[in-house]
Amino acid sequence: MIQGAPPDVVQAARLLACSTCVLVNIGVDRQDLSSAHMTYFYDEDICFTRLGFPHMLSTRNAPPGTGSIQAEVYFSDKYKPFTGTAEDWIEPVIRDLRRCGLVREDDRILSRKAMFLRYANVIFDLDRAAALKTVHGYLDDLGIAYCGRYGDWGYMWTDESFKSGELAAEKALSPQQV
């Protein structure tokens, strides 16, 4: 936060929400885990929202004959606070992978690891538009160029983030900023 920012800007910044994520990575003793390299789950009784299968993206992502699953379990300080540890989610993820039929009872779990990502995705809630206008207006008034997912406070693909950074650099280097 910028020291001395006006109270309305500080309050607006506090209204901007993002998700946090626990990534659970599982190694399994077979590679035919899914026909899709990524899939989504919107069931409230399943702990993960998205699954990726990294072994399908490159033969170097898992040993021959094995498969890998990366499960994403989402939280947010504003709506669903994270408590406990990332490791607390390993067994619930494996349980739900079995419930979905992606991991069978006779599959051998070769590896399991969990990690916590403090900043995952921008949340597009009803507070976002007005709060963003206030924060961006303040930064514009100070001549501060913002960029990327958390500067623009939007969802961006890698190429869009690069372009956002390029535009911010051009703005920062333009003669009008001097």
Give residue spans per PLM region:
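Active-site-proximal substrate-binding core of FAD-dependent oxidoreductases
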Residues: D107-R118, K171-V178
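A conserved FAD-binding loop/helix module that cradles the flavin
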Residues: L139, Y146-Q176
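FAD-binding beta-loop-beta segment adjacent to the flavin cofactor pocket
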Residues: F53, L57-P64, E105, F116-W153
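Alpha-helical elements of Rossmann-like donor-binding domains used by nucleotide-donor carbohydrate transfer enzymes
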Residues: D88, P92, D96, A130, ...
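Short glycine-/acidic-enriched loop or helix-start segments at secondary-structure transitions
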Residues: M1-Q3, F124, M156-W157
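C-terminal helical "tail/cap" subdomain of flavin- and related membrane-associated enzymes
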Residues: E87, E91, G101, R112, ...
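A short, local hydrophobic-aromatic micro-motif
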Residues: T49, L110-S111, L142
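Mid-domain catalytic core of redox enzymes
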Residues: M1-T83, E87-D88, P92-G101
